[in-house]
């Protein structure tokens, strides 16, 4: 039965959004530590509010210089985002930075360093030695909506947010400020995106900017039209799109002065925009021994390769772990009726092609590197502006052979 007129919405935010400032700070601290000590154990949470940054968590590392320089790392990232003046409501050079970081719990460390398989079962494989850093469930997803195999609403929302930042930093629209949000509503027929219904852009701006005569036309021409021209989607009608710019009327007070921010509060923005399920774990500030992060990346890798191999047009995969255990305790594959082979067979070959033990994920995706700060805004998946290891299509042939 045909389903018409269904509207699905996803949102994105810019790097100047308060929650994203926190994600960026947490991941910048992580990268600084990994650059000096790839085996660093890091769990860093950040809070920002008017004039203040608080960085807390647990860290075990030999990167003494990077650890001692965390305050400067925080300031540099805030300034890079664009908060460099009290006129913008926040200044990385003069804000208060408070650090409260302790060591990783030894009870957690023992389960990660010596997994149950090694400690109790006597396993000799080195990859059985590293246990999951926590229990939990993680999802991965891929779909043929876009070349990057992401749901179109979140892919388009991210492109708009990135463009907002580009026109601000390049001086095309110099009156814009760092804080901003985008939202995209798309009409679907039988799971095919057919029409771009509504785009909402809320962007912080200088105080003297006219909404109707300056901001709205500039956003339409320099942001929306540019992104749509670049997107060039085959089935999407954009001729009647409604654009709403700053529906409150103005957006002068923004960033941490407008709202407090916290690490890990944009997990749907970070993943699939609500189109796929989420296990609940945030990414930023966590080293790859935390399966919240590394296993979610691995499952995106699995899903994307399944779709690229032609085994399904869209797929969602779930993995689950017990703390201190190396082997997953659960694996689930859902193809939504789009599989070209028996879905049971897909589920069977996934663990044959992909080693989902934490140590193997870290090895195969080369995750002990300072690559995380670039993921802190505009999504962790389907990125078209940076190369990320979990986006590689290096298992397609192996999957085809396996079926």
From Swiss-Prot:
Keywords: ATP-binding, Cytoplasm, Magnesium, Metal-binding, Nucleotide-binding, One-carbon metabolism, Potassium, Transferase. GO terms for molecular function: ATP binding; magnesium ion binding; methionine adenosyltransferase activity. Mg(2+) binds at residue 19. L-methionine binds at residues 58, 104, 259, 290. It holds the Pfam family S-AdoMet_synt_M. Its cofactor is Mg(2+); K(+). It catalyses: L-methionine + ATP + H2O = S-adenosyl-L-methionine + phosphate + diphosphate. K(+) binds at residue 45. Its EC number is 2.5.1.6. Residues 104-114 are annotated as: Flexible loop. Binds 2 divalent ions per subunit. It is found in: Cytoplasm. GO terms for cellular component: cytoplasm. ATP binds at residues 17, 179-181, 250-251, 259, 265-266, 282, 286. GO terms for biological process: one-carbon metabolic process; S-adenosylmethionine biosynthetic process. Its main location: cytoplasm. PROSITE patterns: ADOMET_SYNTHASE_1, ADOMET_SYNTHASE_2. Belongs to the AdoMet synthase family. Catalyzes the formation of S-adenosylmethionine (AdoMet) from methionine and ATP. The overall synthetic reaction is composed of two sequential steps, AdoMet formation and the subsequent tripolyphosphate hydrolysis which occurs prior to release of AdoMet from the enzyme. Homotetramer; dimer of dimers. This is S-adenosylmethionine synthase. The gene is metK.
């Amino acid at each position: 039965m045909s389903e018409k007129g269904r509207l699905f919405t996803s949102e994105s935010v810019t790097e100047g959004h308060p929650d994203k400032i926190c994600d960026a700070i947490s991941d910048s601290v992580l990268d600084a530590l990994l650059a000096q000590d790839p085996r660093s154990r890091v769990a860093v949470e950040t809070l920002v509010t008017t004039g203040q940054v608080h960085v807390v968590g647990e860290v075990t590392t030999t990167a003494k210089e990077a650890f001692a320089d965390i305050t400067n790392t925080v300031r540099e990232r805030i300034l890079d985002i664009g908060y460099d003046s009290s006129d913008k409501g926040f200044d990385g050079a003069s804000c208060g930075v408070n650090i409260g970081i302790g060591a990783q719990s030894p009870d957690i460390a023992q389960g990660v360093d010596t997994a149950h398989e090694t400690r109790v079962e006597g396993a000799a494989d080195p990859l059985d030695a590293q246990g999951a850093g926590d229990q939990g469930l993680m999802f991965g997803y891929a779909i043929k909506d876009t070349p990057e195999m992401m749901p179109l609403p979140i892919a388009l929302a991210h492109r708009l947010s990135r463009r907002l930042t580009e026109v601000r930093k390049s001086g095309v629209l110099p009156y814009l400020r760092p804080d901003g949000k985008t939202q995209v509503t798309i009409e679907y027929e039988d799971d095919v995106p057919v029409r771009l219904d509504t785009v909402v852009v809320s962007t912080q701006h200088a105080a003297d900017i006219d909404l109707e005569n300056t901001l709205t036309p500039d956003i339409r021409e320099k942001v929306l039209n540019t992104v749509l021209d670049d997107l060039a989607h085959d089935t999407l009608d954009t001729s009647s799109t409604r654009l709403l710019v700053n529906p409150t009327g103005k957006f002068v007070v923004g960033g941490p002065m407008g709202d407090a921010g916290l690490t890990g509060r944009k997990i749907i923005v970070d993943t699939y925009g609500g189109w796929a399920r989420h296990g609940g774990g945030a990414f930023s500030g966590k080293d790859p021994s935390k399966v919240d992060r590394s296993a979610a990346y691995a499952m995106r890798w699995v899903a994307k390769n399944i779709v690229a191999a032609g085994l399904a047009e869209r797929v969602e995969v779930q993995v689950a772990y017990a703390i201190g255990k190396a082997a997953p305790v659960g694996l689930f594959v859902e193809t939504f009726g789009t599989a070209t082979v028996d879905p049971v067979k897909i589920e069977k070959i996934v663990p044959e092609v992909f080693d989902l033990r934490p140590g193997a994920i870290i090895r195969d995706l080369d995750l002990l590197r300072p690559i995380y700060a670039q993921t802190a805004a505009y999504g962790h998946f389907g990125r078209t502006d940076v190369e990320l290891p979990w986006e590689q299509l290096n298992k397609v042939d192996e999957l085809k052979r396996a079926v």
